[in-house]
C-alpha cells in the first residue's frame, strides 16, 4: 500500500499552553471541525476526548500527551486534504517532561494564551522549550469572550515577556460578551461564524466602520513584517504596488518557518469562534516534515560519525521512541515519530541505543485513547507500536543494516521523593510491577529501595506528579499504598581534591584468597548536579585491564548512596593511577570491593558537602499583598531576583530552596485571599547551609 497523503501535506504539531488557557478545549474543537468528533467534548463536564485518563477528567487538567490524527481541507475547502498529527501537552509545571519530549518530535507548535491572563508563567517555560528545539510556532489568543479579555495586551506580552516577534494575522471584533468574530488582516474582511451549526459555516463581511482605522494600521504592520526579509518585494511595496495575497502568505510562511516571526490568531474555542481559521493558519504557516532540516544523529560505529536522515520514504528507516504508555488491553504502547523511510507491521528493526533487535508486532494510529490498526507508516508519521520489548523513551529505532543513533532527549533529575508502603501482603508484589511499569513510561520518575529502612522511595518533579503516580497505582494496578511525607532529593559532592587514597581488599585464610589493591585520586567537577568522570591512568600493567571496569563499577555503586547522608553523589571525578594484583587471588569482585573502600575513605577527606535543589519560583500577586508575599519568600530563604509590572499587580521572580516550599500553595492562598498564583520549576543544585546539612546528617545517623 502506498502513501495516501504526500509528505508536503503533513503537519506534526503540538498544542501547548499555561494550565487553564483553554488548550484541551481548543484541541476538542479541532477534532470536531476536522470531522472526528460528532459531539463536542467539554473539559468542564469531564468528556474531553484528549483527556483520557480518569485523573485528567476528574481534575480538568491534561497530564499525558495524547496523540491524534485529523484531516483538514480549509474553512472554504481551499486546500487539498492535509493530515495533521496533533499532540496535546500538559500545562502543569510538574509535567514539563511531557512538553519537552513532545517538542523533540514536532515540526511546529500552537501556543494557546488566555486573552485575560495573557502570558502566564508556564507559557514562558513552554516557549523556552520550543526555542531549545527550534520549533516554529503560531499563537492562538483564546477566551476572547471572557470578562477582561484584551487581545493587544496579550500580543504585547508575547514581545515583552517571551522576547518573541508577534505579528497579528487577525483582530477580534469586539470582546467579552460582545465578541462577534475576527478581521482577516490579509483579505481585510470580517469573518463571522454561524452559531446555528456550531461554527462549521461562516460568512465574509465588510469590516465594521469603527474598526477600519485600526485594521488598516495592523494590515500595514502585517505587510511590512512579510516583506522585511525580501528586498525585491519591499521595493515593490514601497513603490506603491499592492501585493497579492499569494505573495504576502508566501513571505509570511518563509519567515514563520525560519522562526523570525510568530503569527497571532484569536478567538473563543468555547464559543466555536476562531479555531477554524487557526486550522487554516496551521496549514499555511507551519512546516511540513520535508520543510525542516534533516535530522542529525551518529552512526554507532567506533568513530561515532555524524550522519543525517532526510524526510524521505526512500531513505533508510529511522524513528525516535518519544513515549511509552501502558494500555490495559495490549500492554506497552510505544509512541514513535518516523523521520525517514517506511516500516511495516511484522518488520524487524534495530534499537541502536541498546544494540538490540526489535520487531513491530502491530502498528496503530492513535486518536486520544482509541486505536486504529494500520499496516505501515512513512516518513513524517507519528504512530504507536505494540510488541516492542525493551524500548525506552529516547531510544532510536532504525534499519538493521544502516544503523543511526538520533540525538537523545535530556530529562531532568527528580527533585522530590516520598516513601510508599503497600497496605497488604497482596499489594507488595503488585506494587513492584506497577512502579516498574510507571517508571518505564516516565523518565522523570524514579524508584529505589532505601538501604537502611528498606522502604520503597519514589521520586518525581513535584507533589502533584507523585500524587498522580500513587493515584495511578490504585486505579490501574489495584495497589493500595501508605504514603510518607515528601522528602527533598539532596545530593552529595566534594570541594577538595585528594590524592594517594588507598583501598585494599585482602583475604587469605585457606583455599583461594581474594586480593585487590587500588590507589585513586578524587577531584571535584564543575557543578551541574549529575556528573561523574572515571579516568584510567594505570601505567605498566600494575593492574591488568580486565579489572578496570570492575573498579569503575565499584565506585559507581558507591555513588548511589553517598557516605555523608546516603544521597546520590554528583560532580565528582576519580583517577585510578596505581595499585597491585595477585596472579592467583585477584578477581573482579576483589577489585570492586577495594575500589568501594578507597572511594569511601577518600570522600570523607575531600571536604564533602550536601547540595540542595533550588527552585525558580514565579508569583503573580495583586499589589495589595506584595509586601506579605515577599516577606514570606524571604522567610523561606528565598532570594528575590526581580519583579515585573502587571496591569493589576506584580510578578515576583525568586529562587527558593525546595525544602522550604512544601505547603506553599495553601500559605499563599491564605495570605492573598486566593488572589495570587505561582509556578515553580527546578533551577540548580547549590551547597546547603551548614545548619541544614548538619540536621540532615544527624537525622541519618540516628
Swiss-Prot record:
Compartments it resides in: Cytoplasm
Keywords: Cytoplasm, Elongation factor, GTP-binding, Nucleotide-binding, Protein biosynthesis
GO-annotated cellular components: cytoplasm
Single GO MF descriptor: GTPase activity
Membrane-spanning parts: none
UniProt domain tr-type G: residue ranges: 8-290
Disulfide topology: none
Name recorded for this polypeptide: Elongation factor G
UniProt organism field: Buchnera aphidicola subsp. Schizaphis graminum (strain Sg)
Gene: fusA
Amino acid at each position: 500500500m502506498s502513501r495516501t497523503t504526500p509528505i508536503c501535506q503533513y503537519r506534526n504539531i503540538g498544542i501547548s499552553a499555561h494550565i487553564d488557557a483553554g488548550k484541551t478545549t481548543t484541541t476538542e474543537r479541532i477534532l470536531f471541525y476536522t470531522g472526528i468528533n460528532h459531539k463536542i467534548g467539554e473539559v468542564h463536564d469531564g468528556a474531553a476526548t484528549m483527556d483520557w485518563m480518569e485523573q485528567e477528567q476528574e481534575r480538568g487538567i491534561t497530564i499525558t500527551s495524547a496523540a491524534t490524527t485529523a484531516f483538514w481541507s480549509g474553512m472554504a475547502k481551499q486546500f487539498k486534504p492535509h493530515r495533521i498529527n496533533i499532540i496535546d501537552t500538559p500545562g502543569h509545571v510538574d509535567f514539563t517532561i511531557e512538553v519537552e519530549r513532545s517538542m523533540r518530535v514536532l515540526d511546529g507548535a500552537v501556543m494557546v494564551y488566555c486573552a485575560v491572563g495573557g502570558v502566564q508563567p508556564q507559557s514562558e517555560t513552554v516557549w523556552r522549550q520550543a526555542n531549545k528545539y527550534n520549533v516554529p510556532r503560531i499563537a492562538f489568543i483564546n477566551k476572547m469572550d471572557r470578562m477582561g479579555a484584551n487581545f493587544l495586551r496579550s500580543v504585547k506580552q508575547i514581545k515583552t515577556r517571551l522576547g518573541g516577534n508577534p505579528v497579528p494575522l487577525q483582530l477580534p471584533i469586539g470582546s467579552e460578551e460582545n465578541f462577534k468574530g475576527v478581521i482577516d488582516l490579509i483579505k481585510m474582511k470580517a469573518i463571522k461564524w454561524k452559531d446555528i451549526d456550531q461554527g462549521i459555516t461562516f460568512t465574509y463581511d465588510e469590516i465594521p466602520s469603527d474598526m477600519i482605522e485600526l485594521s488598516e494600521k495592523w494590515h500595514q504592520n502585517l505587510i511590512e513584517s512579510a516583506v522585511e526579509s525580501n528586498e525585491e518585494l519591499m521595493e515593490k511595496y514601497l513603490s506603491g504596488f499592492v501585493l497579492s495575497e499569494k505573495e504576502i502568505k508566501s513571505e509570511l510562511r518563509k519567515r514563520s518557518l525560519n522562526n523570525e516571526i510568530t503569527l497571532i490568531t484569536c478567538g473563543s474555542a468555547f464559543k466555536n469562534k476562531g479555531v477554524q481559521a487557526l486550522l487554516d493558519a496551521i496549514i499555511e504557516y507551519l512546516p511540513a516534515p520535508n520543510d525542516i532540516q534533516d535530522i542529525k544523529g551518529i552512526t554507532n560505529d567506533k568513530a561515532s560519525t555524524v550522519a543525517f536522515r532526510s524526510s524521505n520514504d526512500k531513505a533508510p528507516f529511522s524513528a525516535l521512541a518519544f513515549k511509552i504508555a501502558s494500555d490495559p488491553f495490549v500492554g506497552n504502547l510505544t509512541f514513535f515519530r518516523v523521520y525517514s523511510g517506511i516500516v511495516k507491521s511484522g518488520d524487524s528493526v534495530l534499537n541502536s541505543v541498546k544494540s538490540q533487535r526489535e520487531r513491530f508486532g502491530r502498528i496503530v494510529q492513535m486518536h486520544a485513547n482509541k486505536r486504529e490498526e494500520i499496516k505501515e507508516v512513512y516518513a513524517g508519521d507519528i504512530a504507536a507500536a505494540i510488541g516492542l520489548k525493551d524500548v525506552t523513551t529516547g531510544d532510536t529505532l532504525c534499519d538493521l543494516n544502516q544503523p543511526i543513533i538520533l540525538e537523545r532527549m535530556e530529562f531532568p533529575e527528580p527533585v522530590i521523593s516520598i516513601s510508599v508502603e503497600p497496605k497488604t501482603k497482596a499489594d507488595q508484589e503488585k506494587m513492584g510491577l506497577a512502579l516498574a511499569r510507571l517508571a518505564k513510561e516516565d523518565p522523570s520518575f524514579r524508584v529505589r529501595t532505601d538501604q537502611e529502612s528498606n522502604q520503597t522511595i519514589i521520586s518525581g518533579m513535584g507533589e502533584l506528579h507523585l500524587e498522580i503516580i500513587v493515584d495511578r497505582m490504585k486505579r490501574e494496578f489495584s495497589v493500595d499504598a501508605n504514603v510518607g511525607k515528601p522528602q527533598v532529593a539532596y545530593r552529595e559532592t566534594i570541594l577538595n581534591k585528594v590524592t594517594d587514597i588507598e583501598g585494599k581488599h585482602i583475604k587469605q585464610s585457606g583455599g583461594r584468597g581474594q586480593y585487590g589493591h587500588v590507589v585513586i585520586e578524587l577531584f571535584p567537577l564543575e557543578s551541574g548536579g549529575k556528573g561523574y568522570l572515571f579516568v584510567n591512568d594505570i601505567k605498566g600493567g600494575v593492574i591488568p585491564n580486565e579489572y578496570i571496569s570492575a573498579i569503575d563499577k565499584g565506585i559507581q555503586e558507591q555513588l548511589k548512596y553517598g557516605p555523608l547522608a546516603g544521597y546520590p553523589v554528583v560532580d565528582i571525578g576519580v583517577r585510578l593511577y596505581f595499585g597491585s594484583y595477585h596472579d592467583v587471588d585477584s578477581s573482579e569482585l576483589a577489585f570492586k570491593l577495594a575500589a568501594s573502600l578507597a572511594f569511601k575513605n577518600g570522600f570523607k577527606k575531600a571536604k564533602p558537602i550536601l547540595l540542595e535543589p533550588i527552585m525558580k519560583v514565579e508569583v503573580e500577586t495583586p499589589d495589595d499583598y506584595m509586601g506579605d508575599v515577599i516577606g514570606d519568600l524571604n522567610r523561606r530563604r528565598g532570594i528575590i531576583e526581580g519583579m515585573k509590572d502587571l496591569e493589576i499587580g506584580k510578578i515576583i521572580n525568586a529562587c527558593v530552596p525546595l525544602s522550604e516550599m512544601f505547603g506553599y500553595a495553601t500559605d499563599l492562598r491564605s495570605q492573598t485571599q486566593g488572589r495570587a498564583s505561582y509556578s515553580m520549576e527546578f533551577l540548580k543544585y547549590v551547597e546547603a547551609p551548614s545548619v541544614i546539612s548538619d540536621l540532615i546528617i544527624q537525622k541519618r545517623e540516628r
